[in-house]
Amino acid sequence: MKKVIAIDMDQVLADLLSDWVAYINTYDDPFLKEKDILCWDIKKYTNTNNNVYRHLDYDLFRNLNVIEGSQRVTKELMKKYEVYVVTTATNHPDSLKAKLEWLTEYFPFIPHSNVVLCGNKNIIKADIMIDDGIHNLESFEGMKILFDAPHNRNENRFIRVMNWEEIERKLL
């Protein structure tokens, strides 16, 4: 039986942060930079406060760039593991359709039955989780792989990977 890997979508497969920051900067001042975001709560770095989340809409999620190497390595992982994409989507209902369409376009080799759209990842049971969110890995019981991002740079409790090539070396 294959081991199960749960892979986060935003900031692991899809480059949410750069597009979100660019979108926020069209409405907000001062000019926000990705490297300046040192914690999960992006609203601490903007003048829009809670309204920063209004930018998490269909168009943003549908048009994200693919993280380099993620398609090729995910396809290789599927030969050895049962791969699921697990993404928090129910907190932003406009993202549900967009995320599924995005995955269908850029990761057509992942069946829809292996896509989990949820609100809280603490229900996920797998052998390995790859995520950029510290809070998602804290409650996970398997191997915890932290995908590097500006907001998690001070974290050292998990296996850190800088890119998909490192995931390939560790898991294949």
Curated annotation (Swiss-Prot):
Cofactors named for this entry: Mg(2+)
Keyword Magnesium: yes
PANTHER family for the chain: 5'(3')-DEOXYRIBONUCLEOTIDASE
CDD domains in UniProt: HAD_5-3dNT
Domain of life: Bacteria
Protein family membership: Belongs to the 5'(3')-deoxyribonucleotidase family.
Binding site for Mg(2+): D8, D10, D132
Gene3D superfamilies xrefs: Deoxyribonucleotidase, domain 2, HAD superfamily/HAD-like
Organism phylogeny: Bacteria, Bacillati, Bacillota, Bacilli, Bacillales
Recorded GO MF terms: 5'-nucleotidase activity; metal ion binding
Entry-linked InterPro entries: 5'(3')-deoxyribonucleotidase (IPR010708), HAD-like_sf (IPR036412), HAD_sf (IPR023214)
Keywords from the named record: Hydrolase, Magnesium, Metal-binding
Protein name: 5'(3')-deoxyribonucleotidase
The EC number(s) this enzyme carries: 3.1.3.-
The species this protein was found in: Bacillus subtilis (strain 168)
GO biological process: pyrimidine deoxyribonucleotide catabolic process
Physiological role: Dephosphorylates nucleoside monophosphates such as the 5' and 2'(3')-phosphates of deoxyribonucleotides in vitro. Also catalyzes the dephosphorylation of coenzyme A (CoA), pyridoxal-5'-phosphate (PLP), riboflavine-5-phosphate (FMN) and nicotinamide adenine dinucleotide phosphate (NADP) in vitro.
Enzyme's top EC category: hydrolase
Keyword Methyltransferase in record: no
Catalytic residues, chain numbering: D8, D10
